[in-house]
Each structure stands twice: as C-alpha cells, then as structure tokens.
Amino acid sequence: MKKVLVLILVALMCMQCAALAESEQTYDLSSCEPLKITLPLPNGITAIDTVYTEQWMEMITERSNGLITFDYSNSAALGSALELMEGVDMGDYDMSVIDLANFDAYVPQVDVLCLPYIIKDWDNARAVYMGEPNAWITGLISENMDITVLGTIGMGFRSVISKDPLTCIADCKNYLIRTPDLELYIDALGSLGFSCTSMSFSETYSAIEAGVINGMETTLNVLYDNGYYDVAKYILQTRHFFACSEVIVNTSFWEELPEVYRSIIADSFKEIEAAAWDYAQTTEESMVPKFEEKGVTVYEFSDEDHVEILNIFSDYWREKAVKMGEGADEMIETLIAMQQ
C-alpha cells in the first residue's frame, strides 16, 4: 500500500510539472540585465511550501533564460519565520514564504484567518484563501508593511499525535502536549481541555520519547516526515487550525523590477500555487493509511464533538475579532457564513 501511495503522489507531481511546462509563455528579455534574488525560507526541505518554492524558482530561472537566479536557503538557516518576514519588510531579503500567523504583530487582523476551527474543510480553505478574506488581509499587509503578497500555499490541517488513545473531547482533559508559544494555539488546545506547554520543535521528539510530554500537534505530513509514529501511536484528527504560508516580496524591490520580470515571477507562481494546493490536499488525504502501516491508530471527533466545538468557539471568534482592529468583526461574520 505504501508503495502505491508513493507512486500516486509521484505521478501527481509529474502530471503537474508536465501541465506547467505545457503552459510556458515567451517573454521579451532583450533589454533585461541579470538579477539575483535573495530568498531564504524558514521551513525544511520536505515542507510543502519549500518543495513548491523550489519548483517556482526553477521555473522563473528557465523562463528568464537564466537571467533571474536566486541566493536561496531553507530550514531557517538565516533566521526564524518572524525574523525572515521582518527582513523582507526591511529590505534585507527580497522574498520569502512565511506562515500567516507571523504577521499579527504588524497587522492584528491577520488572526481572523488563524482562529481555531474558522476553516471547515479544504473547499472552505480554498474559498477563503483564494477569495475576499485573504485579499482583504493581504491588502492590509501591503498598507502597513513594505511587503506585497504574491499568493498563498495551503499546508493542511493540524492534528494531535499522542502516546495514549484520545477519541473524544473528554479524553483531552488535562492531557499534556507541546504547542507553539502563541496565544491562539494555547487558547485553542486549552479550550479543548489539553494542558499545553511550549518547547522548541527540535526537542519535542525526545520529550515525548522520555515521557516529559504526552504528545504534540502539527500537520500530518510533518508528523510523518519526522518519524513521530515511532514514539506515539495515536492520532486524533482535531483539525483545529489550517496552516498556510504567504509568498511575500519586498514592495520597494518589486516595484523597481522590469515589468517583464514581474510578469515572469507572478505568472509562474500563479501556476505553482494551484499545483501546490492540489498536492497538499492529496498528501494530507494519503497520510492516514501511511500512519496505519506504521502501527498508528487514527481517530476522528464524533458529530456530537463537532457540535460542542462550534459551541465552544463561536463566541470566542467574535470576542477575539472585536480586539483585532477595524474590519475584523465584519470579516468574522463573513467567515462564519462561508462555513455554511
């Protein structure tokens, strides 16, 4: 089964690459000079946003006949996601790909898209991030920072892996897991009953193995790629957050580029964006059987639990939105309506 799933995913990526190649355009580069773009990434080499950013860079270099190249790094070699975002804002770096939640210190309204359970499913995620809500947020980012958002890469829903079976909300009470040191995460998991502690991602595996904590939460592909199935044998698909990354460029740098370069970069990403979303969804859907092959039991919340979750968070959404700044209270009503 594992080999079949791998072959399916490889075939999907090959089909996507073929489709992208067929759609190539020609550009007038006769008056253009060579350009090197600095593009550091915070995530590791297996992360979906890293994989597709690398494909995007290759496409840009090819379409520019080698005139556009990249000074590229990943795995937070040049700093954390927040540091890289601030570096793009200050003009220290030209581009990056950053989780949306990192922007809230500069644009508090971004948290309206990062609220727990505000994204219902993949169809809803596409409607939100390809539609009015994300357009509003990216407009605010451009107004308040020297940053232009070129697009979004969906990363998937976050779930909890644990050493003990968790099958319902009641099982989560006082269960100790690692969460990022962010208020929204602590609020979300705490509201489900979890006891939350923060530590670096690099320490989490050994902490679970040693029994210091009982589990952690992130996307399924990250859990699998880092081998958490060896130290924790249960997953509860809580789907408490939908993770996404914004593809950003320093606005001053962007506006000084030749129009043909902007077209190459933007056109290429438009094609990569669609492929990345399809791959992220397909990958997430393939994860459950892969975990089961590793001896992991996967649970889902019941319909009754989902009703309780909506009761827990519907008031929370509105209370939080009021504190996020102008327009957030109206946007939360739009997001709630889009879940219907």
Please tell me what each predicted stretch does.
Residues K2-K3, L176:
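A general lysine-centric signal
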Residues E22-N124, P133, S142-N144, T148-Q340:
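N-terminal secretory/targeting leader peptides
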Residues M1-K2, E319:
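Generic cytosolic/nucleocytoplasmic N-terminal low-complexity/intrinsically disordered segments
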Residues A127-V128:
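Ser/Thr/Gly-rich flexible loops in soluble cytosolic domains mediating phosphotransfer, phosphorylation
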Residues K3-A21:
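Sec-dependent N-terminal signal peptides of Gram-positive bacterial secreted proteins and lipoproteins
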